[in-house]
Amino acid sequence: MHKESPIIRRKSTRIYVGNVPIGDGAPIAVQSMTNTRTTDVEATVNQIKSLERVGVDIVRVSVPTMDAAEAFKLIKQQVKVPLVADIHFDYRIALKVAEYGVDCLRINPGNIGNEERIRQVVDCARDRNIPIRIGVNGGSLEKDIQEKYGEPTPEALVESAMRHVDILDKLNFDQFKVSVKASDVFLAVDSYRLLAKKIDQPLHLGITEAGGARAGSVKSAIGLGILLSEGIGDTLRISLAADPVEEVKVGFDILKSLRIRSRGINFIACPTCSRQEFDVIGTVNELEQRLEDIITPMDVSIIGCVVNGPGEAEVSTLGVTGAKTRSGFYEDGVRQKERLDNSNMIDLLEAKIRTKAAMLDGNLRININQLDK
């Protein structure tokens, strides 16, 4: 059963990436990035659609060449999710993807040319209502900043960010968000904390180059978890050397764990011991795969015995407490007369969860209709 998060979020300005609101209390958006060749339109479209299926809010696509810009046009026509074009050095690419309907430009104004070229890009973004993301990375700081600080520090990352922010300020452009990513958790956290005190624009969170699926997820959960718990962050990406779909799943899991944004099922499951009366691990793993399409927020507890089972079930949307041959079943914290056969637990629970999700979705639609009236 859903509980409100105690987190008080940092106040920020509002921008829109396509139809997705960012900042000013909007739901924290989960982003990912394609890792296909952008010029391989079919592969890139297929990957974006796989990200759409797991609920991604925004997808970033690298556009390093004019050929990639032409491919971007075709990609944009075939997907629904807002797209961010990641561009460095060549301002003409930014102008071209703007013409093709890009939803956001990820650029650093200071590395796309002289003042006139920067002005052209910013004027184009303003005319087409396209926001910009300033993206600073601890591994690619400007040479003079590297020489000044000797190594990446929070002050160095923020100085780099403010250098780009000042360029946009001088051009009277305020539709932007900023990131100050680093692969070191403490460096990233301290950089975001410092930046959050200096600007009002939305912040895009990430631990860059976090690592593989396991280590990268842990590192990102620690770093982003700290910042999010302090109310810092308006959008995020989990950077993994893995399938981008995993980035989205981990992102939603972090938000779900902090009760910031719930999407889909929050499984509460015991690590198991010799007291378990059915295969808890197998049941949870199978249900996670079968129920990936469920986006209705709900807590489902699956506990193998009666030690902690009843207590967890009483605070869950649906719950199972292990018993010999047939286990106890709870709905909305209330124990039901019906018991679930352990030998058919997975199929029975899947049916129960899908029925509950449909009912909750129906109630939500009724409430929305009542509000409209």
Swiss-Prot record:
Pathway: Isoprenoid biosynthesis; isopentenyl diphosphate biosynthesis via DXP pathway; isopentenyl diphosphate from 1-deoxy-D-xylulose 5-phosphate: step 5/6. Its EC number is 1.17.7.3. SUPFAM superfamilies: Dihydropteroate synthetase-like (SSF51717), Nitrite and sulphite reductase 4Fe-4S domain-like (SSF56014). It comes from the Bacteria. Disulfide bonds: none annotated. InterPro entries: Dihydropteroate_synth-like_sf (IPR011005), IspG_bac (IPR016425), IspG_bac-typ (IPR004588), NO2/SO3_Rdtase_4Fe4S_sf (IPR045854). Gene3D superfamilies: Dihydropteroate synthase-like, Sulfite Reductase Hemoprotein, domain 1. It catalyses: (2E)-4-hydroxy-3-methylbut-2-enyl diphosphate + oxidized [flavodoxin] + H2O + 2 H(+) = 2-C-methyl-D-erythritol 2,4-cyclic diphosphate + reduced [flavodoxin]. This is 4-hydroxy-3-methylbut-2-en-1-yl diphosphate synthase (flavodoxin). It comes from Proteus mirabilis (strain HI4320). The gene is ispG.
